[in-house]
């Protein structure tokens, strides 16, 4: 059967118009990860971020138009994830001109200046760690009175629970649910491979693991995570986090090298990157990330691995010391870190996992951009490359 072209065109236009009318029906109410109900009377266009390191959220939802929607953000990506910043600036040069805002937690956020920005934000995305303080300070009321909606997201405190909800609620709020659902489908399918593999091997040994938070950021050691942040991956991956007991219920805290030695982890993971200080000076972190400098990575890795107390650990002696790109700790792309952890904690079960390929694929699929880099490593191999 043949349908006349004119009829096909009429049907296509009719369907498209119908979809647009249906999708753009406002007001809509969404419930964010903080349990707040937020009602939107129109489709938000101008987005502000309380932390620029979650810019990938905009990329997932808006693809190549991500930068067009960003009208303000904190300047943390440039300092805390410089290779990420350089990569995005290359892709979206206009990001260099986005107005910067202060940190809510430190009291540097100027609400009056924010309200008067041009173009004016109509949606402010605030991370979960700052939302209660913003409410207590009266910032949420002032923003709401000015017509600026606030949506809470979380990729940091409880990533396994809140990552997909954060993406999907934002997608719903800006009338791009299809993009949110596509991301959720991809993320869930990859996560299920890990969960199902572990379920099929109930007798797999439970490795003891320690995560060194921000390795190389300062000379002191050892900040770490218990239940929150990347520490949340550990029980899901059928491993034991040695920080749980010493931190006694806290999400994050400090352990002495002596306590780490006493606990003797089987696997040691450094969460690190090539931070720069506010005045542009490099730190001693391992500069994993986009466009890696392998000589610099080798040197920084060697320096951190030469700490005498580290060499007293079982993990070191058995060559189970690894590094993960720290910005994954507050990113919707945290799936990549989970895959690295799975390989390192259970190498025999997950030898075929390819986390860097996953990251490249996610960026191409959701951000429509090609990238390469080094986002995780075996530290012993890095020292000998």
Sequence positions of predicted segments:
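Bacterial N-terminal signal peptides that target proteins for export
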Residues: 1-9
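N-terminal signal peptide c-region/cleavage motif recognized by signal peptidases
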Residues: 17-21
